[in-house]
């Protein structure tokens, strides 16, 4: 919970204090995860705080929207990172009896989702002045993890 919930809460809380003190509007952005709506086996310690984080994002929208402080999140899946490294990709692909390439393209669009795609989603939410409480999914299409 410390890394995947409280770090977000601490940053968001301090950011809101600054925005209120300076009487400015702004946007809080939360790095959520597919795990928040579609937990994977043996990923409880990662997924539980991410589920709480999704609700925290929405709570900030409710609590501070009237002050012009927006709160949005990105819900991404299968992005190469320090957590989803080559060893984990190989292990998860082997468990599913697919190649690593097939594992990374295992979505409706059949395309690997890259860090750049996630960065673009964060940028879009940051500049969308009329959007708050939104969770933008960036996963190439994973119906099991869909918010709808």
Model-derived features: where do they sit?
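Alpha-helical segment proximal to the catalytic Tyr-Lys
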Residues: 17, 62-66
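Short, small/polar-rich loop/turn modules that mediate ligand/substrate recognition or access, typified
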Residues: 65, 70, 130-134
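Catalytic Tyr-X3-Lys loop
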Residues: 1-10, 29, 53, 104, ...
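Active-site loop-to-helix junction immediately N-terminal to the catalytic Tyr of the SDR YXXXK motif
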Residues: 39-47, 59
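A glycine/serine/threonine-rich, flexible loop-to-helix segment
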Residues: 66, 79-107, 148
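Active-site helix of classical SDR
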Residues: 12, 49, 57
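Residue(s) in the substrate-gating loop at a strand-loop-helix junction
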Residues: 33
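C-terminal substrate-recognition "lid" of short-chain dehydrogenase/reductases
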Residues: 111-138, 143
């Amino acid at each position: 919970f410390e890394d995947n919930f409280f770090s977000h809460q601490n940053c968001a809380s301090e950011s809101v204090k600054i925005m209120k003190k300076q009487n400015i509007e702004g946007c809080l952005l939360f790095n959520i995860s597919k795990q928040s709506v579609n937990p994977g086996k043996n990923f409880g310690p990662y997924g539980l705080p991410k589920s709480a984080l999704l609700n925290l994002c929405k709570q900030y929208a409710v609590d501070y929207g009237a002050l012009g402080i927006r709160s949005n999140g990105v819900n991404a899946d299968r992005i190469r990172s320090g957590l989803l490294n080559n060893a984990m990709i190989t292990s998860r692909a082997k468990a599913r009896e697919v190649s690593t390439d097939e594992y990374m393209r295992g979505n409706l669009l059949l395309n690997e989702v890259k860090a750049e795609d996630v960065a673009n989603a964060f940028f879009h939410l940051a500049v969308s002045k009329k959007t708050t409480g939104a969770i933008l999914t960036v996963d190439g299409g994973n119906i099991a993890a869909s918010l709808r």
